[in-house]
């Protein structure tokens, strides 16, 4: 883990976990393929403006640079962060993201077959400096709740067409 030290001060970090879940009328492969294809995330993630594939990636990792549009009260701003797809299996997508200063997000998404579809379940772990935590945690919870609704809508509206 990287730590930034400013004038000898190590920031106080705070961590939180939240989970989101939604039923989707689809198959596991279709949903996993969409989640693991970051080039499609500007269509499903409410904050994402731009997704760029990194030129250099560690072995076995798909690395992207993502630009989000954020708002804090009357202030609108953009952030750019690194997002890595660590692993993709038949039904699990594991990702990690990092944005300065010291903001880390880990996402483990599991897609489980159920009658007439699948259940998409996300577990998000956010670690950030204490002063940023409440804002970042609220933004992440709101964005991921909306993203799951958009994944459901996108996948179900494209059934039989390939996503």
Please tell me what each predicted stretch does.
Residues 2-61:
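Hydrophobic ligand-binding cavity/cleft-lining segments
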Residues 24-26, 68-74, 87-89, 101-103, ...:
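Beta-strand elements of well-folded, non-transmembrane domains
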Residues 159-163:
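Charged phosphate-binding loop/patch that engages nucleotide di/tri-phosphates or the phosphate backbone
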Residues 11-14, 39-45, 71-77, 98-102:
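Short, solvent-exposed secondary-structure boundary motifs
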Residues 31-35, 41, 83-85, 120-122, ...:
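Hydrophobic pocket/interface hotspot
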Residues 52-100, 150-158:
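Glycine-rich portal/gate segments that line the openings of hydrophobic small-molecule binding cavities
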Residues 17-19, 76-82, 103-108:
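Short, surface-exposed coil-to-beta transition loops
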Residues 96-146:
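Beta-strand/loop substructures that line and gate deep hydrophobic ligand-binding cavities in soluble
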């Amino acid at each position: 883990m990287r730590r930034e030290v400013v004038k000898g001060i190590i920031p106080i970090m705070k961590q939180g976990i939240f989970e989101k879940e939604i039923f989707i009328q689809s198959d596991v492969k279709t949903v996993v393929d969409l989640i693991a294809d970051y080039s499609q995330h500007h269509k499903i993630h409410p904050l994402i403006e731009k997704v760029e594939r990194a030129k250099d990636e560690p072995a076995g990792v798909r690395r992207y640079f993502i630009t989000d549009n954020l708002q804090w009260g009357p202030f609108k701003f953009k952030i750019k962060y690194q997002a890595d797809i660590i692993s993709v299996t038949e039904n699990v997508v594991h990702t990690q993201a990092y944005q300065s200063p010291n903001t880390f997000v880990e996402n483990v998404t599991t897609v489980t077959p159920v009658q007439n579809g699948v259940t998409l379940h996300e577990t998000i772990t956010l670690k950030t400096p204490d002063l940023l935590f409440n804002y970042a945690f609220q933004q992440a919870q709101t964005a991921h709740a909306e993203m799951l609704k958009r994944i459901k809508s996108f996948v179900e509206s494209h059934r039989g067409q390939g996503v």
